Regions:
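Extracytoplasmic "Venus flytrap"
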Residues: 18-46, 66-67, 147-149
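Pocket-lining segment of extracytoplasmic ligand-binding domains
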Residues: 86-88, 95-98, 108, 123-126, ...
């Protein structure tokens, strides 16, 4: 699942210190997501890894609205390390969509694991409305995710690829907790969760309600993955969530750990090295990510790799293609 690398937008100002030449930051703010999500768990492990494993530095995981907000915080200098979806990272780097006119220099430290697109309904509603393929959500009450979230951005991209107009749907912009409540209270027919497989909030919903995951049919997957290289075909294995025994076809997008262009090169190397030295701790936080949290996954980055991290990967025998090598 290789992703093509984004091309940087014209930046309004040049990085004052140059690529990788900024001062070492002793206290690092790591922006993640909501407290029930995988980003927060992984960010917490990263914070501990930095504090315990990188001399003279400490990390703190911050709760946020996730991908889009994280990249904005990175761009404004209010965050040092951001965890975000690859589609949002690519758009930020190129200054597209939510980042039009406000490009964010974001370079990869690591590619973590894929976020999986879950289109979630309750079984009773799915049967009544005939939700057999994703496009069947037309004329339903559908939550695309919180305003400004990566969840909303990905859902919007899916709508665009499938030529689904927002005027054909009663759109709601709810976070995961509010989407959960609205489904339970029959205020919503379905909604998107673009999250790590086995997400705790979804598992809890499926424990107490009969949940239906709306599959993406073959043609839908083909159209979406052809529209952008940020997305790949994915199958949610049966048994991932309580009560859902069959496999569910959908799409996925890689998650990245990114820093700004002026992030110190040696510091980037040390943090990337410490992460992989302690990779078992990251796997303990998110077991489904075990097969993905390997150095070779960096080849799926949609943006160039930070020079400090690139040095680490090259030492591990990972040959980075030219489009993943950051240009000063």
């Amino acid at each position: 699942m290789l992703a093509g690398c984004a091309q940087p937008a014209e930046q309004s100002t040049e990085e004052e210190s140059g690529l990788g030449a900024g001062a070492v930051r002793e206290q690092l703010s790591i922006v993640t997501g909501g407290t029930t999500g995988v980003y927060f768990q992984v960010g917490g492990v990263l914070a501990n890894t930095i504090t315990d494993g990188v001399e003279g530095q400490s990390g703190s995981a911050e709760t946020t609205g996730a991908s889009v907000e994280n990249l904005r915080l990175l761009g404004s200098g209010e965050a040092d390390i951001a965890i975000a979806q690859g589609d949002a990272v690519s758009e930020a780097f190129e200054g597209r969509n939510d980042f039009e006119g406000r490009a964010v220099q974001s370079y990869a430290l690591a590619v973590l694991y894929p976020n999986v697109f879950h289109a979630v309904s309750l079984e009773e509603n799915a049967v009544e409305l005939g939700l057999e393929c994703f496009s069947d959500i037309v004329d339903t009450r559908y939550s695309v995710g919180a305003v400004g979230s990566g969840n909303e951005a990905t859902t919007t991209n899916v709508f665009s690829a499938l030529e689904i107009s927002t005027s054909d749907i009663e759109i709601q912009q709810l976070g995961y907790a509010d989407t959960d409540s609205a489904l339970r209270n029959d205020q919503l027919d379905a909604g998107s969760w673009v999250v790590g497989e086995g997400h705790a909030g979804l598992s809890e919903l499926a424990t107490t309600e009969d949940v239906h995951l709306i599959p993406m049919c073959d043609e839908e997957v083909s159209v979406i993955t052809a529209a952008t290289n940020s997305y790949t075909e994915h199958t949610i294995p049966g048994g991932t969530y309580p009560g859902i025994e069959g496999d569910v076809q959908t799409i996925a997008v890689w998650n990245l750990m990114v820093v700004g262009g002026d992030f110190n090169e040696q510091q980037a190397y040390d943090i990337t090295s410490a992460m992989f030295d302690n990779i078992d701790d990251f796997v303990a936080a998110y077991a489904p990510g075990e097969e993905y949290m390997v150095p070779e996954s960096i080849l799926n980055s949609p943006v160039p790799v930070h020079p400090g991290a690139a040095r680490f990967y090259e030492e591990q025998g990972v040959e980075l293609p030219e489009d993943l090598l950051a240009q000063s």
